[in-house]
Amino acid sequence: LVVVVFLPFFLSDAVYDWYKSFNAAHGMVMSFLKFAILSSLGEVLGLRISAGVYNRKGFGIIPRMVVWGILGMGINAAMIIFSKGVPQFMEYMGMANAAATFTSEAMSLDKVLVALAISVTMNTIFAPVFMTFHKITDTHILMCGGSIKSLITPIPMTKIITGLNWNVQWNFVFKKTIPFFWYPAHTIT
């Protein structure tokens, strides 16, 4: 199914050109759609790996898609803010032409340095809040039995936050996935 969905983008220049122009003109809409589809697909595959099924009662694929879409718009906003702001800050701190270096076509050590600085800054400031909020929304969806009603039911923040496994959140999610996966991943992308 995934191959069928993506195949037209590889076979038709017209379809791919339309995608690129729509993405450029409607970045937030596309962020919502891409994250709703691809991130939810990742969660479904994760469930398949961990539980042997693609869906189960209470999992809430539709609410997860909506939440991922909203989170995707936040991620898009963060990428714009940090990719513009960090090079400006680097120039303020003394690196000449950091913004122009980052947006140039040419690959250079300075460009990699700017990309790494953007990634480290974004993932240090934004990612912990984002990941915690995502964990809260996932827990809320599960508490609502995976129902679409979870999208309009107030989130019991205190109950969920105090019930989070902070040992895992700190020692694995923050201390391992952010520096060892997200720093390099966002430096490359």
Where are these regions (language model features)?
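Membrane-interface interhelical connector segments
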Residues: 86-113, 144-157
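Hydrophobic/aromatic-rich structural module bridging two neighboring secondary-structure elements via a short loop
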Residues: 50-81
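Hydrophobic cores of alpha-helical transmembrane segments in multi-pass inner/ER membrane proteins
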Residues: 34-44, 128-132
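Alpha-helical transmembrane segments of multi-pass membrane proteins
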Residues: 2-17
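Transmembrane alpha-helix/helix-exit interface in multi-pass inner-membrane proteins
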Residues: 72-93, 119-149
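Loop-to-helix transition at the N-terminal end of transmembrane alpha-helices
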Residues: 21-40
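Membrane-helix interface linkers and caps
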Residues: 14-23, 44-61
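Hydrophobic alpha-helical membrane segments
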Residues: 166-186
